[in-house]
């Protein structure tokens, strides 16, 4: 996939995210240092759940933002190295923060349709 197609997939995801407003949203976040083996035992995981209220793109810092009540989550657009739809209403972003530090963000929307 070329860079423009990859970028367009991410843009399309955020252009259509408003259909999930009001939906329960799960974000599973993992920090790891070895994307080749991706050993779950060597990855630090966090889980957050909230109702998605709004989303936006913050030009300062190139951040993709999702917000819920008492919850705010950002993904660095310029650090995304992978984006895929894992299933119906399930998505995964991988950001690279240094040579060997990666953040995996799995998003699941509990969407009624």
What is the predicted function of each stretch?
Residues 1-17, 21-113:
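Short beta-rich binding modules
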